[in-house]
Amino acid sequence: HSGLYGGAVHNPAEVLAELVAKMHDEKGRITLPGFYDSVRTLTPQERADFARLPNDDASYLKETGVPALWGEEGYTSAERTGARPTLEVNGLLSGWTGPGSKTVLPAKAMAKISCRLVADQQPSEVKKQMIRFMEENAPKTVQWEVKDLTHSPFAIADLNNPGVKAMHKAMESVWGMRPFYRREGGSIGAVAMLQQICGVESVLVGMGLPSDNVHSPNEHLHL
């Protein structure tokens, strides 16, 4: 009961909120220690390819309905979503969230977090960075735990791969225009597994539309 213990014990929900807020700085960069150390730098040609993409800030605003865009300084929205790592809070849970009011102190607080990894980041290293962040920032007034629910390594296509070149030629022949090379932040764990275990490259071709509502209850694909 908050009337009995409020002000004497640290509220887990408030602690979690403070920790989550600290995971990004004012420039949109992730503050986990060493998070960017192994991130592969975009080449001038790669940035030029991103600049060719039809997606601009106006299209992101229209698709999402947000009042303004946000992200890591120094990169375009296309680069942020396709080539830069992210840390996203997927969900928060704590205390009483049902109808009416209850003046209680929550015993626990939980955040589900996902990280988009890019070349050459490794999931095992990012977990260590998260634990180090918690060690450096979590107060001694609470107990905490980091659970690794699932992970997969990064995957990036080699544009000089014969399969990619063949697909490029076929698409240009059919559509009469040079195809765009676009990096996608969505994960397909099997791609990295095929690269690492079988030594084969995958050719990924986007057939979906922004209106397909990926991961939504009404996700669909036009045929």
For each predicted feature, which ranges?
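Histidine/acidic-residue-rich, glycine-tolerant segments that coordinate divalent metal ions
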Residues: H1-H10
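Glycine-rich phosphate-binding loop plus the immediately following alpha-helix
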Residues: A13
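Non-catalytic, usually N-terminal nucleic-acid engagement modules in DNA/RNA processing proteins
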Residues: L16
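Hydrophobic "lid"/C-terminal helical patch
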Residues: V20, M130, M134
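An extended, acidic, His-containing surface patch that forms the Zn2+-binding/catalytic region
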Residues: T31-K108, R116-Q129, N137, T141-L223
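Active-site helix-to-loop segments that bind/position phosphate- or nucleotide-bearing substrates
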Residues: I113
